[in-house]
A protein has these predicted regions:
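Conserved phosphate-binding catalytic cores of ATP/NTP-utilizing and phosphoryl-transfer enzymes
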Residues: 1, 106, 110-134
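A short helix-loop
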Residues: 2, 9-10, 27, 129-131, ...
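General beta-strand structural signal in soluble alpha/beta enzymes
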Residues: 6-7, 75, 108-113
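Short glycine-rich, Thr/Ser-proximal phosphate-binding strand/loop in the N-terminal lobe
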Residues: 10-48, 153-156
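Conserved phosphate-binding loops in N-terminal lobes of ATP-dependent enzymes
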Residues: 40-42, 46-67
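Phosphate/ATP-binding catalytic cores across multiple sugar-kinase/actin-like superfamilies
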Residues: 57-61, 236-251
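Short beta-strand-loop/turn "lid" adjacent to the catalytic site in phosphate-handling enzymes
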Residues: 59-98, 102
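Short, acidic/small-residue loops that bind anionic groups at enzyme active sites
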Residues: 94-117, 160-162
Length: 251
């Protein structure tokens, strides 16, 4: 039985996992802690938290792992598959993975965080492997449409001219008093609103395939200040993003 270990230390989750020929053996993750009212962490603080989290998560992963079966360790070494792509938080995972690979005497496989997202989306959809397809990566630091070719090379097609979708969500959420990162909480609020009752609308701004959330965020902040119910604004935000992404993909 062959097994592979994976490590990812991104903004804002520490993740370690192991898979074998039968599937997922272990999948452990911890969200980084951000103080109430703040909209993120400095890279140095994120790096420190990742190191502390790995100290706990890695031994827990090895409890379920047959060490002798490990054939490689894969790590997200950078945000995107570009030579100039760099973010300090990924150094925590890279150092941890390199140490594990050296100790186990197996290869270290370096990938990018974005490639990991794409491959995770293909889990259960392997029929897409080996053929070109359109992909979209949406997070706090990325809002991109790209083409993935037969060799799994990623070519950027479009993105955002200002805020990323995740930043849009987090800024609205923090203004509502939610804890960063706000995605799950804002999504829950949106689920409480009944669109059949009407509600406010936020514009979906896309120019030449490139989106913009800066002006939309300003409008959403004004709605919060005006006392519009948070669930209604949350629904409007997700409706806006859905229409925005649709325009980007159809461009």
């Amino acid at each position: 039985m062959c097994a592979y270990v994976g490590v990812d230390t991104s903004c804002y989750t520490t993740s370690v996992a192991c898979v074998d020929e039968c599937g997922i053996v272990s999948d452990l993750r911890t969200v980084l802690s951000v103080k109430q009212g703040e909209r993120g962490l400095r890279q140095s603080d994120g790096l420190f938290q990742h190191i502390r989290n790995l100290e706990r998560l890695v031994p827990e992963m090895f409890e379920k792992l047959d060490v002798g079966a490990v054939r490689g360790v894969c790590v997200s070494a950078r945000p995107r598959p570009n030579e100039d792509s760099y973010m300090p938080v990924f150094l925590a995972g890279k150092a941890c993975a390199a140490s594990m690979a050296a100790a186990l005497r197996v290869p270290l496989l370096a990938a990018s965080h974005q490639e990991g997202h794409v491959r995770a989306a293909l889990y259960g959809n392997e029929f897409l492997m080996g053929q070109p397809f359109l992909g979209m990566h949406i997070s706090g630091g990325t809002t991109e449409v790209f083409l993935v070719d037969e060799a799994f090379h990623i070519t950027l097609l479009s993105g955002t001219e200002d805020l990323h979708a995740g930043q849009f969500v987090d800024r609205i959420g923090v203004a509502m008093g939610l804890r960063f990162p706000c995605g799950k909480q804002l999504e829950a609020l949106a689920g409480e609103f009944d669109p059949a009752t009407g509600g406010v609308k936020l514009p979906a701004i896309v120019r030449n395939g490139v989106c913009s959330f800066s002006g939309v965020e300003t409008r959403a902040q004004a709605l919060i200040d005006d006392g519009i119910k948070h669930g209604e604004i949350a629904y409007a935000a997700y409706d806006c993003m859905a229409r925005t992404f649709g325009k980007m993909l159809l461009y």
